[in-house]
From Swiss-Prot:
The gene is ispG. Belongs to the IspG family. Binds 1 [4Fe-4S] cluster. This is 4-hydroxy-3-methylbut-2-en-1-yl diphosphate synthase (flavodoxin). GO terms for molecular function: 4 iron, 4 sulfur cluster binding; 4-hydroxy-3-methylbut-2-en-1-yl diphosphate synthase activity (ferredoxin); 4-hydroxy-3-methylbut-2-enyl-diphosphate synthase activity (flavodoxin); iron ion binding.
Amino acid sequence: MHNEAPITRRKSKRIYVGKVPVGDGAPIAVQSMTNTRTTDVAATVAQIKALERVGVDIVRVSVPTMDAAEAFRLIKQQVNVPLVADIHFDYRIALKVAEYGVDCLRINPGNIGNEERIRTVVDCARHYNIPIRIGVNGGSLEKDLQEKYGEPTPQALLESAMRHVDHLDRLNFDMFKVSVKASDVFLAVESYRLLAKQIDQPLHLGITEAGGARAGAVKSAIGLGLLLSEGIGDTLRISLAADPVEEVKVGFDILKSLRIRARGINFIACPTCSRQEFDVIGTVNALEERLEDIITPMDISIIGCVVNGPGEATVSTMGVTGGSKKSGFYEDGVRLRERLDNDNMIDQLEARIRAKATILDAARRIDIQQVEK
């Protein structure tokens, strides 16, 4: 029930990764990357399907060898989500996966080779109508830029990116997006800000090698949150040393928190104190797990007492305000006569939230049909 974010997005060109639109006002796409051995086709396919179930828009797959390229062909046949092939060092692998139907090529200018090899990759991408992501990384800058700047700086990352943007421009190829990732939040943020002023291509956001599940999520939320709040960014990936499924969840949580893109339930819950009338923490944890399959955007407030409960509930799709033995229940901002038993809170809320999701989905389908007419 909250309003959309007061964010004006940076204008950028439109490209497509498979059927997913990127840039020019398209929804910000959430990306992840497999961490299986690509040659283990079954494991990689299983992981991609797990990512699909939590709503991933694009999946990147590392293709380090020709054997991995052959495995990629089999993987591509078994999944629905667009796949980006991550290519380093051997440009010939890019040519092979392009033949096998890759949806996007990610190349690192610092290690893909000389200009002639880049030209060959670009000509191949043009032939198959495949976009490219120029992936600049603070940890793998070109040697001459390392010598020039001494260490990764925003200017160094910008110069690396612009060097290869200019190269693609000379080759008359404009189906590309760019990233300038770094593990340091300030370095990454400033690099993206500089790049956003220089080009109008879509930008892929990320804080590279951000860390484990908790620290990496925090670091990514700060860095990407700053950029997204300034309207910068068209796709994103949360790089975590964790299950890739968690990357997707954190990515959507960041977009949801900024009210940029809603998917699933936004739980509003108090941290609890001695005033709580029911187990708020247990209730929220259980509902988050039980309702992971719900993709309908909803704000659900779960507050343990009457201090802030009514205020939050009146601006939520559904809300609970803690009371003695039974708690107040709100729907669409209106308090209902019906109260919920504190001892059976989780089951009652799950049933009501699922029913509400069904109603909202049906209404949305009707709206879409009317627009199409």
